[in-house]
A protein has these predicted regions:
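Alpha/beta-hydrolase-fold serine-hydrolase catalytic core, especially in secreted/extracellular enzymes
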Residues: 1-154
Length: 154
């Protein structure tokens, strides 16, 4: 097995020029796997249970059913209106939206919508939560960009 040790310096030099976009303004993804249930700031913790007919295990691929449709997740940030919009088709019962100060201004009223349903507090003021920050840093291991708030559709 070749180690490609002579390429490591080239790879590291290439990586210096790349920056991770922690918070893209929008994203659109599709999934057929129950464990692919989190994308950037959107998580669907019970995706496999909510939509068993839309999920397929890789060992069963290609799916035997022609009715199998991927779950589509789209989200956009509107910084001028302090709004986060999430659209999931087909709809799932439980969606979590994680927020950071890079996404919304916690000092102003904000709106968070999942499938056109408001999930933010009635007064629009979203309060950061230290427990969410610590748990997120622990589970994701990203101590530089932890999520500050989680809003749930349940």
């Amino acid at each position: 097995m070749e180690g490609f040790s002579e390429e490591i310096l080239h790879v590291l030099e290439w990586m210096k020029r790349r920056r991770r976009n922690v918070v893209p303004m929008e994203f659109a993804v599709e999934t057929l796997r129950p464990w692919n249930s989190g994308f950037w700031w959107v998580e669907m913790p019970h995706l496999g249970a909510d939509l068993p007919g839309n999920m397929v295990d890789p060992v069963d691929f290609p799916a035997r059913s022609s009715l199998l449709r991927p779950v589509s997740v789209e989200s956009k940030l509107f910084r001028t209106t302090n709004t986060v919009s999430v659209s999931i088709k087909p709809r799932v019962a439980n969606v979590q939206v994680f927020l950071t100060p890079d996404m919304i201004d916690f000092g102003a009223k904000a709106a968070v919508k999942v499938n056109d349903k408001n999930i933010h507090p009635p007064n629009g003021m979203i309060e950061p939560n230290i427990e969410v920050m610590l748990e997120d840093a622990r589970t994701r291991g990203d101590r530089l960009h932890p999520f500050w708030v989680v809003l749930d559709t349940r």
